[in-house]
C-alpha cells in the first residue's frame, strides 16, 4: 500500500522514468492473443503482468478501465484487483471508472477503490453535482479524482459544446469542480 500522495507519486514516476505516459490496461477479448484465451486459466492477469513487466520503466501511470474487466464477470474483477496489486508501488494507478453517484454510494466507491484496492485516482462523472466528487476527495487525503469535463467521442458536442451563447456545459463543469476541489485535501484533475 502506497503512502505517497497521488501527485507526488505521479511526479516522481515522471522524473524517474522521464515519462508522461499513462498506459491503459483495457483487455479486449478480440485483441488478446489466442493462446492467452485457450491455454491460460486466467488470461487477463498473465497478459497484464507481461505488459506491466515490459513497460514499468516507461510509464508514470497505469489506467485500467473498469468496464473492460466487468465484461469478464467475477473473474475479471479478480483479475483487476490482482493487476492493481501487481503494479509497482512507485507507479500511479488511475482507475478509469467514470463513476458518478451521490452521497453514500460515492462514499462506498471511495472505500472500495481507495481503501481496499488502493488506487491513487479515479475518473468521475460530475453530472449529479458536487455529491459525485466531494465524498471521494474527503475519503483519503492525497488521493485524486479526474472529473470528466470534455470527452473526445463524436456525440460529446451535443451536451459538452456550446449549449447557448454561453460557455457550455464543459466550462461549467470545470468551474464547479475547481470549487469542489478547493474544499478538501484531495486533488482534482480534468479529462
Can you say where each PLM-predicted feature lies in the sequence?
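Active-site flanking residues adjacent to catalytic metal/cofactor-binding acidic residues
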Residues: 25, 95-97, 124
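Short acidic, glycine/proline-enriched helix-loop-strand junctions
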Residues: 91, 96, 142-143
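Conserved PLP phosphate-binding loop immediately N-terminal to the Schiff-base lysine helix
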Residues: 67, 71-73, 97-107
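Conserved anion-binding
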Residues: 28-29, 101-191
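Conserved N-terminal beta1-alpha1 strand-loop-helix module at the mouth
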Residues: 1-64, 69-82, 86-93
Amino acid at each position: 500500500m502506497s503512502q505517497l500522495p497521488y501527485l507526488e507519486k505521479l511526479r516522481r514516476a515522471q522524473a524517474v522514468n522521464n515519462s508522461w505516459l499513462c498506459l491503459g490496461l483495457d483487455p479486449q477479448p478480440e485483441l488478446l492473443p489466442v493462446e492467452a484465451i485457450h491455454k491460460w486459466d486466467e488470461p487477463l492477469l498473465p497478459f497484464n503482468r507481461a505488459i506491466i513487466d515490459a513497460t514499468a520503466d516507461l510509464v508514470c501511470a497505469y489506467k485500467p478501465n473498469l468496464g473492460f474487466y466487468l465484461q469478464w464477470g467475477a473473474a475479471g474483477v479478480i483479475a483487476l484487483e490482482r493487476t492493481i496489486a501487481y503494479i509497482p508501488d512507485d507507479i500511479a494507478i488511475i482507475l478509469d471508472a467514470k463513476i458518478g453517484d451521490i452521497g453514500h454510494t460515492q462514499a462506498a466507491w471511495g472505500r472500495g477503490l481507495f481503501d481496499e484496492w488502493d488506487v491513487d485516482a479515479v475518473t468521475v462523472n460530475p453530472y449529479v453535482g458536487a455529491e459525485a466528487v466531494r465524498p471521494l476527495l474527503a475519503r483519503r487525503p492525497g488521493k485524486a479524482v479526474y472529473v470528466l469535463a470534455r470527452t473526445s467521442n463524436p456525440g460529446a458536442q451535443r451536451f459538452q459544446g456550446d449549449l447557448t451563447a454561453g460557455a457550455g456545459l464543459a466550462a461549467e463543469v470545470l468551474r464547479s469542480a475547481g470549487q469542489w476541489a478547493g474544499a478538501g485535501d484531495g486533488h482534482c484533475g480534468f479529462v
